[in-house]
Amino acid sequence: MEKKTLSDIATQGKRVLMRVDFNVPLDENKNITDDKRIVESLPSIRKVIEEGGRLILMSHLGRPKGKVNAEFSLAPVAARLSELLDCPVGMAKDCIGTEVMQQVLALQDGEVLLLENLRFHAEEEANDADFAKELASLGEIYVNDAFGTAHRAHASTEGITHYVQTAVAGFLIERELRYLGKALQEPERPFVAILGGSKISGKIDVLENLFKKVDTVLIGGAMVFTFFKAQGYEVGKSLVEESKIELALSILEQAKAKGIKLLLPTDVVVTAEISADAESSVASIADMPNNLIGVDIGPETAAAYRNEIIGARTVLWNGPMGVFELDNFATGTIAVAQALADATAQGATTIVGGGDSAAAIAKAGLASEITHISTGGGASLEFLEGKELPGIAALNN
C-alpha cells in the first residue's frame, strides 16, 4: 500500500508535528556519543523549515519508565540539532499542557520547537487515547519519520493518527518502505538473503516469509550449529538450541520443497574461548574438534558466499556471520560486508537490516557503499517477517 509522504503536502504556515527517533546514546556528562539518528532525520526537518512550516518535533529517549527523569531529557539533543541546522531550536519543558501549547502557538514560520521526552508520560507506551489527542492538538499536520519505533503502537506513532486529518511518512520512512518494500514485493533476481545471528528462534519468521520471495539463502552465525546438529554432525561446544532441532530440519525440508538454494558453511573458525586474544583455527564441518567452539564462518565458506552475493541483483543481509565484535572473529562478517559493497558497485540493490549487521558494515568502513542500511532494528525485522507495522499502517494512503 502506497503511503502519502512529506513530498505530497504543503507545510508553509502550518504547524507540523513530526515524530522522530532521537533516541541517541549519551555519556555520563550528557554528551551525545553518536548523533547518527539526528543526522538521519535532517532531510525531513529541513524540508519543513525551508518551506516555512512551523515545526514541532517529538521523540523518546531511553527508558524513563513513565516518570520525569532529568537523565533522559532531550535538552542535549536540542543543542546538537541547533548546531546541525545552524538555527535556534526551542526546548519545551514537557510534551503536553498549557505552557507547551503557548510555545507552539508562538512559533513563527520556519521555527523549530523540540518537545520533552514523550516517555516521561506512561500514557505514551500505553497508547492512551486522551494523551494521543492532546499531542494531536499541537499540530495541523502529522509526520512520522521514526522507523525504529514504527512496530510499536504508541500514542505518538499510532494513537495520534486517529485525531489528525493529515498523517504522512517522512523521508526516512519513505526510504525504508521503498527499499525493504521493493525487496519483498518485486525484487530484481537473483535475490539472495543472508541470515546470521545466534538463534534460529529469532529468525524463523523472517526465514519463512523470505522463502516466499528469495532464490538463495546463506546462513551464518551460531544458528548454523543447530542446523548441523539436526543433520547429525558433532559441533563441539558450539551454541545449539536443542529445542529447535526439529525446526531446523523442517526449514531445510521447506527450502528443498520450494526449490530454494540454502547454503550452510562448509568450514568454521573454532576456538577454546571467546576472548580478544584467543587462539583460533579453521575446521571443516565434518570434523569439528569436540572441545572447541565455532565463532565465525571459515575462508572456504566466505569465498562461496561471496560468489553467491556477487552474482545477485538484490541482496538482503540480516545478522552477523560470527562474533564480529571481536576483531579476531570478525573476518567472515567483514568478508560478507565487502562482498555486498562489491555487488553494489556492479549495480545490485543491497539492503542491510538490523542493528548488528549495520554495526558490522560500519566496522568495515563500508556504510557509504551499500544501497540501503535500515535504521530500525526490531522494526526492520518485523517488516521482513511480513507483519504490518502499526505506525506505518496508520498513515494516510
From Swiss-Prot:
GO CC, alphabetical: cytosol
SUPFAM superfamilies (UniProt xref): Phosphoglycerate kinase
Pathway terms, separated by semicolons: Carbohydrate degradation; glycolysis; pyruvate from D-glyceraldehyde 3-phosphate: step 2/5
Assigned EC number: 2.7.2.3
Keywords: ATP-binding, Cytoplasm, Glycolysis, Kinase, Nucleotide-binding, Transferase
Domain of life: Bacteria
Main location: cytoplasm
A Pfam family recorded for this sequence: PGK
Binding of substrate, residues: D21, F22, N23, R37, H60, L61, G62, R63, R119, R152
Binding site for ATP: K203, G294, E325, G354, G355, D356, S357
UniProt GO molecular function: ADP binding; ATP binding; phosphoglycerate kinase activity
Catalytic activity: (2R)-3-phosphoglycerate + ATP = (2R)-3-phospho-glyceroyl phosphate + ADP
Keyword Cell wall biogenesis/degradation assigned: no
Biological process, per Gene Ontology: gluconeogenesis; glycolytic process
Alphabetical list of CDD domains matching this protein: Phosphoglycerate_kinase
Keyword ATP-binding among record annotations: yes
Enzyme class: transferase
Annotated compartments: Cytoplasm
PROSITE patterns per record: PGLYCERATE_KINASE
HAMAP family per the UniProt record, alphabetical: Phosphoglyc_kinase
Assembly with partners or alone: Monomer.
Homology family: Belongs to the phosphoglycerate kinase family.
Protein name in UniProt: Phosphoglycerate kinase
Organism per entry: Chlorobium chlorochromatii (strain CaD3)
